[in-house]
Amino acid sequence: MDSVIRALQPYFERIPSVERPKGHVHFREKFGWTAAILLLYFILSNVPVFGLSPESIDIFAAYRALFAGSTGSIIALGIGPIVTASIILQLLVGAGIIKLDLTNPEDRAAYQDFQRFLVFVMIAVEAIPQIAGGLLKPDLNLAAQLGVSPGIISFLIFIQLFIGGVLIVYMDEVVSKWGIGSGVSLFILAGIAQSIVVGLFNWVIPPNSAMPAGIIPRWIWIAQNYPLDQLFTGSGLAFLLIQGGILALITTAAIILLVVFFEGTRVEIPLAHAVARGARGRFPIKLIYASVLPMIFVRALQANVVALGQVLHARGVTIFGEFVNGKAVSGLMFFLQPVSSPYDWIPSLVKSQGAAFAAIPDWMIYLHLLIDALILVVGGIIFAWFWVETSGMDARTVASQIAKSGMQVPGFRKSPQVLERVLSRYIPKVTILGGAIIGILTLVANMLGTIGNVSGTGLLLAVSIAYRFYEDLAKEQLTEMHPLIRRMLGEEA
């Protein structure tokens, strides 16, 4: 397959892309591009899809914090196509089906060009089944008013979703090449931050509920409607912890502190410049070396599988499971859908959601929790390994970059091979350990719940992305000081 990719690369190269800057982009300009794209993202998230029926179902609603975007908007697909394309490529490379040497600049260019092409394919692949499966429904009243068939409205819905997906791709490229960090991370952080703020202060009372959705308004409502002696009983404290949102608040704060701690835990390899006498530094290998981005791939893979089951269920195919209110209640899909709150694994809370949920046996609920734990931990390790190998973070690539900057490990011969041996002592082990830790943290956060229902995965992503964004800001300000620093950090002067 790699020969096919190389043969088709001239055609992939013709796909328009954002041009890379030819020199160093100053910090103010990078910050300006980042802020402009963020503003555009929020504007697009409030542009509704023309002709979409209010009865439509968002199959990615439970993963909205992960995929960014906004339900019912033209960017409803969010970063889903980008993530799905990355998953497919990483699996193909990991399985040896695509045998490209990603340390070779030509092979890496072919890989990236094919990835861009695959993203556009995935935009169509993710939009068409939702429309054809009857989940994204055309507005029949609008079709009657315009005197056109519902099929025409469905086609317009597809065009809008495709345009929105393409805009997300190019907005990501603008941030990655001209801004700070990556667009994917920026969109995730923006969406999760918005959800947390809404989860804290939302005064709106949801349907079938007597309490406001936001935690702070909910506390005020509880204080006005419940006497203290009732709240300080066993059932009252359980009510405050779960329905009152105290457990979600504690979990959110604890996960933030733990992620910051693990992000700051690292092994530092001393470096010295071969020419500039006295110039020394350290190469940090973080405990969460692959960051939490591989966890996106784990959840995205789950989301696509469960979404396929939901599309089939909408077409009357229930062999893989039945869905009620967007949640699987039977079959394979029940075990594969993620745990996102106490209402997904505590039997009494699961069964309180309706008659269909009350019929689920306890053993199925506990087995669902066990399977999700295995998916998170094992999947976190596998995708962390794939991410390191395919994103240029492996020992060989890092050693080559350090050698090109003129740095070496004191007391060792100046050679990329020597550097690679030193780095190989740490990077593979830290990659596996970090992937497992992120999987466990995600599981705990999902089990206990979070503010704004952003899910444990979303919260971990938000904290890690914010931490890395802070580091990127510090790095950008540092590179403004002198061209030599930019060369040592692997940037063009």
From Swiss-Prot:
Keywords: Cell membrane, Membrane, Protein transport, Translocation, Transmembrane, Transmembrane helix, Transport. PROSITE patterns: SECY_1 (PS00755), SECY_2 (PS00756). One of its GO terms (biological process) is protein targeting. Residues 49-59, 135-151, 202-244, 314-367, 450-454 are extracellular. Residues 60-67, 68-79, 80-88 dip into the membrane without crossing it. Belongs to the SecY/SEC61-alpha family. HAMAP family: SecY. This is Protein translocase subunit SecY. It comes from Archaeoglobus fulgidus (strain ATCC 49558 / DSM 4304 / JCM 9628 / NBRC 100126 / VC-16). The gene is secY.
